[in-house]
Amino acid sequence: MENIYTSAAQLIGHTPLLELTHLEKKYDLKARLLAKLEYFNPAGSVKDRVALAMIEDAEQKGLLTPQSVLIEPTSGNTGIGLASVAAARGYRIIIVMPDSMSVERRQLMKAYGAELVLTPGAQGMKGAIAKADELAREIPHSFIPGQFVNQANPQAHYATTAPEIWQDTDGQVDAFVAGVGTGGTITGVGRYLREKNPAVRIVAVEPKTSAVLSTGVPGKHGIQGIGAGFVPAVLDTKIYDEVIPVADEDAFATGREIGQSEGVLVGISSGAALWAAIELAKRPENAGKTIVVLLPDTGDRYLSTPLFAD
């Protein structure tokens, strides 16, 4: 029987879990450490799930027409995912992004046909959101999916990411670790896993120098994709048991380490999440437990960043 897909959107999801056996051995971890490799999505990141969910939700609600112009403020991966889905569906798309994001991200969005508007990096995501709102007022037929406020974001993870984790581990998952950007991943996955097993520990990861969830104080940091500098509307702040702040240098070092030890090339926020997961796995109370860490994207869009600096 043929197993042939007719659209790139059909390739989104069903990403694999990889046990990080080399890191388990290196750090003498007594817990089992499983990485969900989201770079297996067609446009290379977990945000493919969110992009597809937001566009399909808008289409079902009659909010999009062939004349629609999608405008989205994004630090990168959602823009790449939206550009991919928009290209396949024939929509014009404008991405508004802080100029502090990697040059590879810009090139990838342009490769999918997106138009780019850059905002000052010092303004963070707040600056990009304000500019997107301004453009939406000026451009006819514009629609902002709005990943920071759109409930289709966490719902995508509740409906796809979390069930995949549950099924692939046969329900044997004791802790879930994820970085917080919009908060969609940890909210959606956390809710589903909690419904299945209230004892599952949900751990959020944020940049140490912009520890908004821990301290309420935003700041500059180098971990692209997490640490938006505010508490996003879609984030359920009651869903996580613990927040682990991660230093930029630890995120970079761990991101490099998984490539060189496991043969898996991932991005900066993956390094941050993995550093936190390793710290969790070192704790004596987690001996014999299974920890799942979500690694959001591929490292090849960070080759120009300090992640892979010589």
Regions found by a protein language model. Name each.
Residues 1-310:
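PLP-dependent amino-acid enzyme catalytic core
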